[in-house]
Amino acid sequence: MKNYQFSTALLSSQIQGKKLRFPCPAKINLFLYITSQRPDGYHELQTLFQFLNFGDWLSIEIRTDGKIILTSEIPHLKNEDNLIYRAAKLLQQKTGCTLGANLHLDKILPIGGGVGGGSSNAATALVALNYLWNTQLSLSTLAEIGLQLGADVPVFVYGKAAFAEGVGEKLTFCQPPQKWFLVLKPETSISTAIIFKDPNLPRNTPKRPLAELLITKYENDCEKVVLNHYSEVEEALGWLLQYAPARLTGTGACVFAEFANEQAAQSAFLDKPEKYVGFVAQGTNISPLHQMIEYLSQQKQTLCLPNNTNSRG
């Protein structure tokens, strides 16, 4: 896996080019508790999302003909089914914007790892195109569009670390400690259907206020069930636990260990077995995507936008 982190230098060095590259940050679930199962089968939860300064890159170049042209490094996925393409089309439909875009995804995050890659890609497309096309939708409106693409898309749209409740739609922004993490992807993919159908999955963890959860040991209710079904995840987690507190993110397959500083995380990373892909990154309570949008706004960059093309419909 390509191993570099987002930074201001990486963001600022590209500004003079015709294309802009926007970060699609990973996320981790610092904790995840399942509090109930609704009659419709959906599970209610309490979870804490934090972004990482590591992820995919989405390159964007504006077109004047309204076409959305996407190239990516994801095999066997039609563009029409890609969340990036769908996000761009939904934004056009919502705003009546007549501009288009050339989009290229530099895929770095592991697919199916539970670190939010697809949701982050969709959110970056929405937020970045809203900025570049000057469609001026609010984040709440973009989040509503994003919810059509996936339950986790809104948290990436808002770009702040968040405590999520319900089925993930109730968000409370917060500021957990920004630690360093070593994230590993075992050589397996998780079936969420298998996990959520397992009778041993906890479904009645008592709801607790955020203030209490933040000072309690963080756990993931899905972890034991995932480990029972996937020995590869159990092995990877066991390896991480030699170095630091570690657990599953989401339903996996990625697992992560938390460290107080980068040096300790990098030291463990150097010992990583070759069969694991992984990366070291710092948690951040403000999404690198939103940091870049803010940077562009502060620099007052003059983007080559055609005149009179912003139609709100």
Swiss-Prot record:
GO molecular function ontology, one term from the record: 4-(cytidine 5'-diphospho)-2-C-methyl-D-erythritol kinase activity
Residues annotated as catalytic: 27, 152
Keyword entries, A-Z: ATP-binding, Isoprene biosynthesis, Kinase, Nucleotide-binding, Transferase
Domain of life: Bacteria
GO BP of this protein: isopentenyl diphosphate biosynthetic process, methylerythritol 4-phosphate pathway; terpenoid biosynthetic process
Catalytic activity: 4-CDP-2-C-methyl-D-erythritol + ATP = 4-CDP-2-C-methyl-D-erythritol 2-phosphate + ADP + H(+)
UniProt enzyme class: transferase
A Pfam family the protein falls into: GHMP_kinases_C
Keyword Membrane tagged: no
Binding site for ATP: 110-120
Coiled-coil regions listed in the entry: none
InterPro entries documented for this protein: GHMP_kinase_C_dom (IPR013750), GHMP_kinase_C_sf (IPR036554), GHMP_kinase_N_dom (IPR006204), IspE (IPR004424), Ribosomal_Su5_D2-typ_SF (IPR020568), Ribsml_uS5_D2-typ_fold_subgr (IPR014721)
Entry annotated with the keyword Kinase: yes
Pathways per UniProt: Isoprenoid biosynthesis; isopentenyl diphosphate biosynthesis via DXP pathway; isopentenyl diphosphate from 1-deoxy-D-xylulose 5-phosphate: step 3/6
Listed EC numbers: 2.7.1.148
Function: Catalyzes the phosphorylation of the position 2 hydroxy group of 4-diphosphocytidyl-2C-methyl-D-erythritol.
Family per similarity comment: Belongs to the GHMP kinase family. IspE subfamily.
This protein's name: 4-diphosphocytidyl-2-C-methyl-D-erythritol kinase
Protein species of origin: Histophilus somni (strain 129Pt) (Haemophilus somnus)
Gene for this chain: ispE
